Regions:
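Alpha-solenoid repeat junctions
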Residues: 48, 76-80, 115
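N-terminal interaction/assembly modules
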Residues: 1-49, 53
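Residue-level detector of extended alpha-helical repeat arrays and alpha-solenoid scaffolds
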Residues: 30, 34-37, 65-66, 84, ...
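Mid-chain, well-packed structural core segment of small domains
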Residues: 60-86
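Amphipathic alpha-helical scaffolding segments comprising HEAT/armadillo-like alpha-solenoid repeats
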Residues: 3-6, 46-57, 81-93, 120-123
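Short coil/turn connectors between adjacent alpha-helices in alpha-solenoid helical repeat scaffolds
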Residues: 22-25, 39-42, 76-83, 121-122
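Short, Lys/Arg-rich amphipathic alpha-helical interaction segments
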Residues: 85-123
Length: 123
């Protein structure tokens, strides 16, 4: 994972943050950025723990932390337990934020699916 990959991930997250949902071109740019973020996470997963750790610095940045928390866990990356817990704490923070009604609801649903998946895989 090169520093340029991490910087591009930041840029993709900024594109998503700046999305104007009333403008189709902006929405298309948002969708391309999300796809590119997932590709970056997949690349890190393929490269292994050191690459995941390099990308994980973005969990401490406001614009990237939420995107990366979901994406690391969604992609089934071999995330070390401490990073998994950090990602889950970020997602739980969204789920418990009453000022973010739609995001909170979606995060609670995501957490339910996560827990179901991991309960069944630990049996």
């Amino acid at each position: 994972m090169r520093a340029s990959d991490v910087e591009r991930y930041r840029q993709y997250a900024k594109t998503c943050q700046d999305t104007d949902y009333g403008k189709p071109d902006s929405v298309r740019a948002h969708n391309r950025a999300v796809t590119s973020m997932y590709k970056t996470v997949e690349k890190a997963a393929a490269e292994g723990n050191q690459a995941i750790q390099a990308l994980a610095i973005l969990l401490d940045e406001p614009i990237t932390r939420e995107w990366l928390a979901f994406q690391l866990l969604d992609k089934g990356c071999d995330v070390p337990p401490d990073l998994e817990q950090k990602c889950l704490q970020i997602i739980q923070g969204i789920a418990n934020d009453p000022s973010r009604y739609a995001d909170a609801f979606a995060s609670r649903e995501w957490l339910k699916r996560w827990e179901q998946k991991h309960q069944s895989s630990s049996r």
